[in-house]
Amino acid sequence: MQSNMQLEPNFWQTKSLLEMTESEWEALCDGCGKCCYRKYIQGRSKRQKLYYTRIACNLLDVETGKCGNYSERFNIETDCTKLTKKNLPDFHWLPDTCAYRLLYEGKTLPEWHPLISGSPHSVKNADILIKNGIHERDVIDWFEFIIDEDHTFK
């Protein structure tokens, strides 16, 4: 997440996702860390179900929702996913609260989003962070940590 100091005010309302600079794109991230929690897919084709877990990437600080080594994450965690302007349509599993997903779907940012609230603490204060996260290295059975199921997975 970038500082708002160098960004145009309300850029997300005046620019499309494709028109945004790299700094603007990064600033859209609210820092909830939900994309860094593991997902589990069960079934095939129309019977596929996506399960969200409270199992976090080993780099994620589960208290703050921030990556412990953001600049090197792709080198350290081989399955770390890079969300870009071009591959965003493939990320239908992003949480309903994700700014990238919201803007892609033509929706507005929530009041607690740091770009709206002006506070980097608003995500935590709004109770958006996943509670009782556990690192992947500490997990044996993923099924014990399922927290939600998305029935709309395609």
Swiss-Prot record:
Signal peptide: none annotated. It comes from the Bacteria. This is UPF0260 protein NTHI1811. It comes from Haemophilus influenzae (strain 86-028NP). InterPro entries: Puta_zinc/iron-chelating_dom, UCP006173. Belongs to the UPF0260 family. PANTHER family: UPF0260 PROTEIN YCGN (PTHR37421:SF1). NCBIfam families: PRK05170.1-2, PRK05170.1-5.
